[in-house]
């Protein structure tokens, strides 16, 4: 007699705690075709890091109430995953646990969850709804955003999010990979935009940063290829490395007079950027700050600048550069590969 196979919503259910166990089970089960549901063993307390990473044939995860922790990247890249039920035994969800699960459309966080890591749902391009139990003491949802209640930090956003006015910080990777996000209003309660907060939001075309913001984190808008304009107020004192790298649609950028350092890769690969006016608050242009801005023909370097890092303008189209006497250090190949320009390493004293 053939063994009866358990099903879930019409799919075969396979019990396994990681991808290796899943492969072994599939080898023994003739005729099983994806998609299928995976059931975690009822004796499992923690789903380990990378347990099912990139298992694209999994459509549903059945997690028992013995599980208290979902580890780092446990289900990252499970693009076929459309359904996951997190039981009320789970207290911790690790960094990038469901990263790039593009088939997920909604998530529900129960009242037991006390800690959610960075980028937990980053790159979930299909996500349109976020719900948190009203009884959860650590987190709440508002405007399709998941918010850490005590710190007022927006942890997870999605394509349909509206940032509430209670938020003071947009956390690391909060909107990363939300490719269907075309516009976002940042309220003037926000003081910090975290690392990779809007990275790879390719549908964003413009954004206005309120004058309450003092810091833009590393890679905050990296890879926002559709971004054509951005307004940065004078309140911003720090723009992190690679903050606007790969923003291939930007033609102009205003660097506020409050910034003292243009960090590494800040505007790298901004291929349509044609001119830059660097304010006299800037003292340092770090390595590869404007590398491969292939249409950059003009840059004004003020006499406040003392340092220009390695390959700062490498691969640009600069035809003339006025380097003031204030500059004491020019790094290796700082302007090399610009038409008509050649330069050896120079240290000015």
What is each of the regions a protein language model found here?
Residues 148-151:
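Short acidic-glycine loop/turn motifs at beta-strand connectors
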Residues 1-17, 32-46, 56-69, 79-92, ...:
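Structural signature of tandem-repeat unit edges
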Residues 19-22:
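Short amphipathic alpha-helical segments that mediate assembly, nucleic-acid/protein binding
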Residues 49-51, 71-74, 94-97, 118-120, ...:
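Consensus positions within tandem repeat domains that build extended binding/scaffold surfaces
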């Amino acid at each position: 007699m053939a063994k009866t196979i358990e099903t879930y919503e019409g799919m075969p259910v396979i019990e396994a705690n990681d991808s290796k166990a899943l492969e072994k089970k599939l080898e023994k089960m003739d005729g099983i075709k994806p998609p299928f549901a995976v059931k975690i063993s009822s004796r499992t307390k923690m789903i380990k890091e990378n347990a099912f990473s990139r298992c694209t044939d999994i459509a549903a995860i059945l997690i028992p109430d013995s599980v208290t922790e979902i580890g780092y990247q446990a289900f990252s890249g499970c693009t076929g995953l459309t359904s996951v039920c997190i039981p009320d035994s789970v207290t911790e969800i690790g960094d990038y646990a469901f990263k790039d699960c593009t088939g997920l459309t909604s998530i529900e966080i129960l009242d037991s969850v006390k800690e959610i890591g960075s980028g937990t749902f980053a790159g979930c391009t299909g996500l349109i709804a976020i719900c948190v139990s009203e009884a959860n003491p650590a987190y709440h949802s508002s405007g399709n955003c998941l918010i850490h209640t005590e710190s007022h930090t927006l942890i997870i956003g999605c394509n349909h999010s509206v940032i509430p006015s209670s938020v003071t910080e947009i956390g690391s990777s909060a909107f990363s990979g939300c490719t269907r996000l075309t516009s976002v209003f940042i309220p003037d309660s926000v003081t910090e935009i975290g690392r990779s907060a809007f990275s790879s939001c390719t549908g964003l075309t413009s954004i206005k940063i309120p004058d309450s913001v003092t810091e833009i984190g590393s890679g905050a808008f990296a890879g926002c290829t559709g971004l054509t304009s951005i307004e940065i107020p004078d309140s911003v004192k720090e723009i992190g490395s690679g903050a606007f790298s790969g923003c291939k649609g930007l033609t102009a950028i205003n660097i506020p007079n409050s910034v003292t350092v243009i960090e590494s890769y800040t505007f790298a690969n901004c291929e349509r950027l044609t001119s830059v006016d660097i304010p006299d608050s800037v003292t340092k242009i770090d390595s590869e700050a404007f590398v491969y801005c292939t249409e950059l023909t003009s840059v004004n370097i003020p006499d406040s600048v003392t340092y220009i890092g390695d390959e700062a303008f490498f691969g640009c189209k600069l035809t003339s550069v006025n380097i003031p006497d204030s500059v004491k250090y020019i790094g290796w190949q700082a302007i090399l590969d610009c038409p008509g320009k050649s330069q050896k390493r120079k240290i000015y004293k």
